[in-house]
Amino acid sequence: MTVKPLRDVTPKPLEGEERLEQSLRPATFDDYVGQVKIVDNVKVYAAAARQRGESLDHVLLSGPPGLGKTSLAHILARELGVTLHVTSGPALVKKGDLAGLLTALAPRDILFIDEIHRLSPAVEEALYPAMEDYRFDVVLGAGLGAQTMEMKLERFTLVGATTRTGLLASPLRDRFPIQERLEYYGPAELKEIAVRAARKLGLPVDEDGAEELARRARGTPRIAIRLLQRARDFAQVEGDGRLTREVVDRTLRRLEVDARGLDAMDRRILAAVIDTFGGGPVGIDAVAAAVGEESGTLEDVYEPFLVREGYLARTPRGRVALPAAYAHLGRDRPGGKQGSLV
């Protein structure tokens, strides 16, 4: 039987994962692992707003997917003692979709919009007066006889999450007084996250097993938890129920996640740049066509890790394979130097 591995290390949430993520999600700032500076800052902002009895200023959270932006929004709502209303940019198709959400907000509630960079222009424009003046303008009629009716809104907090800050229009981005960027996690932080999650799942875990899983989780908590789930399955069926280094190695080998945390799609991307396009530079659309994936998915999901780990470079002329990519795939670099298969 062939295991299909391509989706196991994507930091995007997979279908059916939301329920598990909610059960493992940190409940308070003290439970939240990593992003120390951001958590410390946001904790102060939330405490000050609560003491003054005011709504928190609007917050923009950016960074690669799977790093805990949604978890921070949930914690903020809990710390402020308000209700969190969750939606996403693609879900807000018409102004009416936004109006329904905004008019349902109680004082100081939080509206969380994931993938806020994907808002339609019409919805984005309607959001501006809501953020600044806490009003929503409704146009009645059409043409010369059209009239604008102003609907007053309760003072609320908008928390926007984005993986691509550059796609946000400047007028929208500038309306967020609080802007924080989440960064990839270190192995020690991911190990702590894995150990805590294993404890909640009732899974005994060895120190070296947790360390190995964390080392190969691409700096992303969501991936660490996903790999932990799969390792739990192998520990239960093919082991003694304990998460050991051997179980983690076996699990990731079956999922085709290599020793550096690269999966099959990562290797296909690097191979395409090197073998098909001579190492680059090559445009992202050409790479996407070569590997059979959408260019936006490559930019959001795969490239950040490959760039951060030194396998790929983004240049004004396109993507370029770096020496580490040649070495990892065992390819000869231009100039004749032999790579070594890692």
From Swiss-Prot:
Belongs to the RuvB family. It is found in: Cytoplasm. Mg(2+) binds at residue 70. Its EC number is 3.6.4.-. Keywords: ATP-binding, Cytoplasm, DNA damage, DNA recombination, DNA repair, DNA-binding, Hydrolase, Nucleotide-binding. It comes from Anaeromyxobacter sp. (strain K). GO terms for biological process: DNA recombination; DNA repair. Residues 1-185 are annotated as: Large ATPase domain (RuvB-L). The keyword ATP-binding applies. GO terms for molecular function: ATP binding; ATP hydrolysis activity; four-way junction DNA binding; four-way junction helicase activity. This is Holliday junction branch migration complex subunit RuvB.
